Each structure stands twice: as structure tokens, then as C-alpha cells.
Amino acid sequence: MRRRWLAGLAVALFVLWPGSAQAHLVTTGLGPVYDGISHLFLSFDDLLPVVAMALIAGLNGPAACRRALFTLPVAWLAAGAAGYASGVAPLPAGVASVSLLLLGILTAADRKLAPSVVTALAMALGIVHGWSNGAGIAAAGREGRGLIGITVAIFVLAALVSALVVSLRRPWARIVVRVAGSWIAAIGLLLLGWTLSGRSR
């Protein structure tokens, strides 16, 4: 009995022992493209706006989905390449929280937007976050090919989420999407408050 307890304690210590933490760019050891893919799914300040954008596109129908699906990754990649080339991030720290707040509110409101408005939102989101990613990759001394991984992951995620939302026919399902938007807006408001209070660093 004592041996099992000691073995369990040893396993628990091994599993719970803190390792080194990296705040932003993740290295998987599989190359820069996979690092970019993992970056998107591990950075909620990039992941949640993409999900919110896909929810908005899905709520506004197939035409808006198709336009946003191609506009968002292309704008993200182009702005990321420009940010990588410049190496300077001129945007303030609270931009991610503002985009979360705005996109969350638009999702929760469920107002019918023209496909051109959804496309403009996707382009603005791609430019702002793409620039920030490109500048961050350059500042960390990583390869720019990580932007390709981020872009591919954005395309796949946006396609899956927006297609799911477009396929929803029941009124209660749209309410679930709106509730998700309200949670995203709440997270954005929380992050904005945190950033403005100076505790984000």
C-alpha cells in the first residue's frame, strides 16, 4: 500500500512540476508552420476574434460566409507579412480586447449585416491582428513562415465555425450563437479593463 502511495506521489510530482512558460509564441519543434498553427489555437487574443468573426459571418448567410472566409486569411497574411517586414507594432496593447468586444456585441445583437460590411469587418480584423502577429514573430526572431500556419489554421477554423452556424435552422440554435457572442463580448470587456488598469504586463 505504501509503495503505491509513493508511486502515485512521484507521478503527481512529475506531472504537476512547473516547467518553463512562454508568454506568446509557441515552439512545437515541428517547424515554423506548425508553430503558427499552434500559436493560433493557444493564443486566445487571436483565436476568439476569429471565432467571433466566423459566428457573425454564419449569422449573415452563405454569401457573407464565403466573402469573409477568403478575406480574413488573405488580409491576415498580407498584414502579417507587412508587420514582419517592418518589425514594428504601432498598435496599442488593447486592440485585441476592443476587437473581441466589438465582434462579440455584433454577434450577440444578431443584426442583419450586408455581405460588404461583413467583408470589411473581416478585412479590418485580419489587418489588425495579422500586423500584430507579423511584428511579434519578427521581434522574437522567428521565421516568417509561421504566418502561413496561422493563416491556414484561420481558414480551416473560420470555414468550420461559419458552416456550422449557417446550417442552424432552429430559432433556439441562433440564440445559442448569440449567447456565445455575449460571452466573447464579456471576455473582451474584461480584457479591456485589465489592459487599461495596467495589469496586462
Label the predicted regions.
Residues 2-201:
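Membrane metalloprotein/metal-transporter helix-bundle signature
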